[in-house]
């Protein structure tokens, strides 16, 4: 690296000024393809956004907080957008189209998808709407699949997704249901799962002969419920 009038460049061992990506002592830098000037801050390259340290120009990876917003940069340095990243507590952060952590944007996608599926028949072991129908667990799996999150096809997989909710559920939480009174039920085998929509309402694929519906949680008559939070 060398500076000219306060601007940084990089030349190879032959003294030839470089452009584009260069790796120096294990660190990546980006040099303007026209001028060779070392770039800093946000830069778009090949359809992806990267963040280069404002002081050193070093390409950043992992979590980045800027102006109060959180971003996630893959090991390649590329910013994650319109996708989810698993965080340390087992939940996921949804990164919106601008790359910012935006839980509400993720919830909105899930709710829009759920509304679009109203009336789809219940089909045991059905996976996708185009298969002719879905069951309760593939319904909630499909909703979270829209965010790039795999919570599993079965209720006994989904009971371990995200974190257990102690207290009132929030929109986007999944609620697992048991119908036998204690001790006549197996807490490891939930009998039903639904999406909590807020205000005491849920979206669900109900049971044989039913169709995807928007109903009250209370109407389900479950003896025991637990909730899991996937998005945070």
Q: Which residue ranges define each predicted feature?
A:
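Extracellular adhesion/carbohydrate-binding repeat motifs centered on closely spaced tryptophans
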Residues: 1-108
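Glycine-rich nucleotide phosphate-binding loop and flanking beta-alpha elements
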Residues: 17, 101, 182-183, 209
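Short loop segments at secondary-structure junctions
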Residues: 34, 55, 76, 180-181, ...
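Aromatic- and glycine-rich peptidoglycan recognition patches
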Residues: 40, 105-113, 156, 163-166, ...
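Short histidine-centered beta-strand/loop micro-motifs
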Residues: 62, 185-188
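Exposed loop/turn and edge beta-strand positions of beta-sandwich/beta-sheet ligand-binding modules
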Residues: 89, 130, 190
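Catalytic cysteine-centered active-site loop
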Residues: 116-171, 176-178, 182, 222-225
């Amino acid at each position: 690296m060398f500076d000219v009038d306060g601007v940084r460049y990089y030349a190879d061992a032959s003294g030839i000024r470089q452009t584009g990506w260069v790796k120096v002592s294990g660190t990546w830098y980006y040099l303007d393809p026209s001028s060779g000037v070392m770039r800093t801050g946000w830069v778009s390259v090949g359809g992806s956004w990267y963040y280069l340290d404002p002081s050193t120009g070093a390409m950043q990876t992992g979590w980045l907080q800027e102006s109060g917003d959180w971003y996630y940069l893959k090991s390649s340095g590329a910013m994650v957008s319109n996708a989810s990243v698993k965080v340390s507590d087992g939940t996921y952060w949804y990164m919106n189209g601008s790359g910012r952590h935006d839980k509400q944007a993720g919830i909105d996608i899930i709710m829009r998808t759920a509304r679009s599926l109203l009336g789809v028949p219940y089909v045991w072991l059905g996976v996708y709407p185009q298969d002719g129908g879905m069951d309760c667990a593939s319904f909630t799996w499909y909703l979270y699949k829209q965010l790039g999150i795999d919570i599993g096809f079965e209720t006994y997989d989904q009971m371990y997704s995200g974190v257990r909710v102690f207290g009132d559920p929030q929109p986007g939480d999944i609620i697992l249901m048991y119908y036998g009174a204690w001790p006549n039920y197996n807490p490891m085998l939930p009998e039903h799962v639904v999406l909590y929509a807020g205000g005491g309402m849920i979206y669900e694929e109900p049971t044989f002969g039913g169709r995807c519906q928007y109903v009250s949680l209370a109407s389900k008559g479950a003896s025991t419920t637990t909730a899991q939070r996937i998005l945070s």
